[in-house]
Protein backbone atom coordinates (compact mmCIF):
# COMPACT_ATOMS: atom_id res chain seq x y z
CA UNK A 1 0.00 0.00 0.00
CA UNK A 2 1.43 3.41 -0.90
CA UNK A 3 2.32 5.47 2.17
CA UNK A 4 -0.06 8.32 1.27
CA UNK A 5 -2.94 5.83 0.97
CA UNK A 6 -2.04 4.42 4.37
CA UNK A 7 -1.96 7.91 5.89
CA UNK A 8 -5.36 8.70 4.34
CA UNK A 9 -6.82 5.45 5.69
CA UNK A 10 -5.52 6.02 9.21
CA UNK A 11 -6.69 9.63 9.20
CA UNK A 12 -10.16 8.48 8.11
CA UNK A 13 -10.17 5.77 10.79
CA UNK A 14 -9.42 8.40 13.44
CA UNK A 15 -12.34 10.46 12.13
CA UNK A 16 -14.64 7.42 12.08
CA UNK A 17 -13.83 6.49 15.67
CA UNK A 18 -14.14 10.10 16.85
CA UNK A 19 -17.47 10.40 15.03
CA UNK A 20 -18.85 7.17 16.52
CA UNK A 21 -18.98 5.40 13.16
CA UNK A 22 -16.42 2.81 14.30
CA UNK A 23 -15.54 1.50 17.75
CA UNK A 24 -12.13 1.33 19.37
CA UNK A 25 -12.66 0.46 23.05
CA UNK A 26 -9.90 1.02 25.57
CA UNK A 27 -7.27 -1.69 25.63
CA UNK A 28 -7.19 -4.28 28.37
CA UNK A 29 -3.99 -5.11 30.21
CA UNK A 30 -3.25 -8.44 31.83
CA UNK A 31 -0.11 -8.70 33.96
CA UNK A 32 1.99 -11.75 33.13
CA UNK A 33 4.93 -13.08 35.17
CA UNK A 34 7.52 -11.51 32.84
CA UNK A 35 5.60 -8.67 31.26
CA UNK A 36 2.17 -7.70 30.02
CA UNK A 37 -0.51 -8.94 27.65
CA UNK A 38 -2.43 -6.14 25.94
CA UNK A 39 -5.74 -6.72 24.12
CA UNK A 40 -7.06 -4.07 21.73
CA UNK A 41 -10.44 -4.66 20.10
CA UNK A 42 -11.92 -2.70 17.23
CA UNK A 43 -15.03 -2.72 15.06
CA UNK A 44 -15.55 -1.36 11.55
CA UNK A 45 -19.26 -0.67 11.28
CA UNK A 46 -21.20 -1.40 8.12
CA UNK A 47 -20.29 -5.07 8.11
CA UNK A 48 -16.62 -4.49 7.34
CA UNK A 49 -15.29 -6.51 10.25
CA UNK A 50 -13.93 -6.60 13.73
CA UNK A 51 -10.45 -7.19 15.04
CA UNK A 52 -8.44 -7.77 18.15
CA UNK A 53 -4.74 -7.09 18.44
CA UNK A 54 -2.87 -9.11 21.05
CA UNK A 55 0.44 -7.65 22.15
CA UNK A 56 2.95 -9.05 24.60
CA UNK A 57 5.54 -6.80 26.20
CA UNK A 58 8.38 -8.87 27.65
CA UNK A 59 11.38 -6.71 28.59
CA UNK A 60 13.55 -9.74 29.44
CA UNK A 61 13.39 -10.81 25.79
CA UNK A 62 16.10 -8.28 24.97
CA UNK A 63 18.63 -10.49 26.78
CA UNK A 64 17.31 -13.50 24.85
CA UNK A 65 17.81 -11.81 21.50
CA UNK A 66 14.04 -11.72 20.98
CA UNK A 67 11.75 -8.75 20.35
CA UNK A 68 10.49 -7.19 23.56
CA UNK A 69 7.16 -6.42 21.88
CA UNK A 70 5.38 -9.10 19.85
CA UNK A 71 1.90 -8.89 18.39
CA UNK A 72 -0.72 -10.51 16.20
CA UNK A 73 -3.98 -9.16 14.83
CA UNK A 74 -7.02 -11.35 14.27
CA UNK A 75 -9.49 -10.02 11.68
CA UNK A 76 -13.05 -11.32 12.12
CA UNK A 77 -16.02 -11.27 9.76
CA UNK A 78 -18.48 -9.00 11.59
CA UNK A 79 -21.54 -10.79 10.18
CA UNK A 80 -20.55 -14.41 10.82
CA UNK A 81 -17.94 -14.05 13.55
CA UNK A 82 -15.61 -16.26 11.51
CA UNK A 83 -11.87 -15.54 11.64
CA UNK A 84 -10.70 -14.21 8.27
CA UNK A 85 -7.03 -13.32 8.76
CA UNK A 86 -4.20 -13.58 11.24
CA UNK A 87 -1.66 -10.82 10.63
CA UNK A 88 1.69 -9.64 11.98
CA UNK A 89 0.57 -7.12 14.57
CA UNK A 90 4.02 -5.66 15.13
CA UNK A 91 4.37 -4.58 11.49
CA UNK A 92 0.78 -3.30 11.38
CA UNK A 93 1.43 -1.29 14.54
CA UNK A 94 4.56 0.25 13.03
CA UNK A 95 2.65 1.10 9.84
CA UNK A 96 -0.33 2.58 11.70
CA UNK A 97 1.83 4.57 14.11
CA UNK A 98 3.90 5.94 11.25
CA UNK A 99 0.77 6.83 9.31
CA UNK A 100 -0.59 8.61 12.39
CA UNK A 101 2.60 10.66 12.48
CA UNK A 102 2.15 11.41 8.78
CA UNK A 103 -1.43 12.54 9.36
CA UNK A 104 -0.40 14.74 12.28
CA UNK A 105 2.48 16.19 10.25
CA UNK A 106 0.16 16.93 7.34
CA UNK A 107 -2.32 18.69 9.62
CA UNK A 108 0.03 20.45 12.04
CA UNK A 109 3.43 21.11 10.43
CA UNK A 110 4.11 24.04 8.14
CA UNK A 111 3.75 23.10 4.48
CA UNK A 112 7.36 24.11 3.83
CA UNK A 113 8.86 22.17 6.77
CA UNK A 114 12.06 20.63 5.44
CA UNK A 115 14.03 19.34 8.46
CA UNK A 116 13.21 16.10 10.26
CA UNK A 117 14.77 14.94 13.52
CA UNK A 118 14.20 11.25 14.26
CA UNK A 119 14.77 10.22 17.86
CA UNK A 120 15.13 6.48 18.26
CA UNK A 121 15.69 3.65 15.84
CA UNK A 122 13.21 1.07 17.07
CA UNK A 123 10.72 -1.00 15.11
CA UNK A 124 8.52 1.99 14.27
CA UNK A 125 11.26 4.41 13.20
CA UNK A 126 11.32 3.56 9.49
CA UNK A 127 7.56 4.02 9.09
CA UNK A 128 7.70 7.30 11.02
CA UNK A 129 10.28 8.65 8.57
CA UNK A 130 8.49 7.27 5.48
CA UNK A 131 5.26 8.95 6.50
CA UNK A 132 6.81 12.36 7.13
CA UNK A 133 8.74 12.15 3.84
CA UNK A 134 5.43 11.45 2.08
CA UNK A 135 3.78 14.66 3.32
CA UNK A 136 6.60 17.19 3.60
CA UNK A 137 9.56 18.19 1.40
CA UNK A 138 12.22 17.01 3.84
CA UNK A 139 15.76 17.85 2.74
CA UNK A 140 17.68 17.07 5.93
Describe the predicted segments one by one.
Residues 1, 136-140:
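Short, intrinsically disordered, charge-balanced linker/junction segments flanking boundaries
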Residues 98-101, 109-135:
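Glycine-rich adenosine-cofactor-binding loop
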Residues 1-94, 102, 112:
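N-terminal ligand-binding/catalytic initiation module
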Amino acid sequence: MPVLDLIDAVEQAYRDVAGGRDASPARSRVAMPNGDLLLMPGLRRGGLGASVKLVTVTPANAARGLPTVQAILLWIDAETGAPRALLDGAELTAMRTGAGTGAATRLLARADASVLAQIGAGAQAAWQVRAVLAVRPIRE
